[in-house]
Structures are given as structure tokens and as C-alpha cells.
Amino acid sequence: MRRYLDVLACFPNTPIVYIDETGIDTYLYRHKARAPRGEKVYDKVSGRRFERISVVAGQIGSKIIAPLLYHGTMTAELFIKWYQEQLLPSLTEPHVIIMDNAAFHPKKQLDELAVAKGHYFLPFPPYSPELNPIEQFWATLKRKVTELLRTGRSVQSALEYYFKTK
């Protein structure tokens, strides 16, 4: 942790972009259920696997950049493609790019790509999601998507609507 903070302190005037991904099961909200009048329904969700819609994005201050919605789970190939084709082109000045240590993040390759475009790459210390402010955004996003599902939208359309109005 100390090393991470020392390295970060070397860039006092460089903007930081935090990047991360999250996923939402399409069975997040049930439109119909039964319970006594006036009571909420609580039920177990079956062990069945449902389709997953995932999102990867960056956050600079309170602004979300380069969001990508995709079906399924993240792979190294998809992450590199998003990083090269969406994230890096959206950064118009040098940034410190900070991300977690997920297994599918090929750190050496991501560092090389960042440096080639004039950016700095800094992974978080292991097991430190509390340092990543985009985690708070994901929590808000999931709460808002759940609210939008109550209006009859699909998870996909709720996510698209949220990013358009954010």
C-alpha cells in the first residue's frame, strides 16, 4: 500500500482515470410475485444461471468515460480491445490510469499501451477495492437499474437509458 501511495504522489497535477468492470444478472428484478397485501415479497433466487450484462468504464472525477456494455463475462481480449479502442482515445491529455488486479488484466501489455500514448499506468495494491471510487458508481448504477426495471424496462435498456441521462 505504501509503495502505491508513494508512486501516486509523484503525479500531483496529473488527472487520474479509475477503470473497472461490473456485471448485472438479467434476473435482478421480478415483475410478478405474490405476498399478502401491503407486504414485500422475499424469495430465494434459484441456483439457475441467468444471462449477465456487464459494463466496463473509466471514471475521472465524477465523470464516467468510455462505457461499454457487453453480454457475458470479461476476458483479457475484450478488455484489451476496449482499453485500446475506447479508453485510450478518450483521453486527450496524459492521465494516470489506475485499475484493480483482476486476473484478466494483462498488466504488462496495458502498461505498454498506456506509455505509448503518453499515459502512466498504476495497478491498485492487491485486495483494495475501497481505493477505487468507481466502485461507488457501480453501486449507484445497480440501484438505479433496479428502479428502472420496475418501469418494465429490460436490464439492457435500463443500462443504456442510465448512461444516456448520466
Please place each PLM-identified region on the residue numbering.
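Short functional hotspots at interaction and active-site rims
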Residues: M1-K166
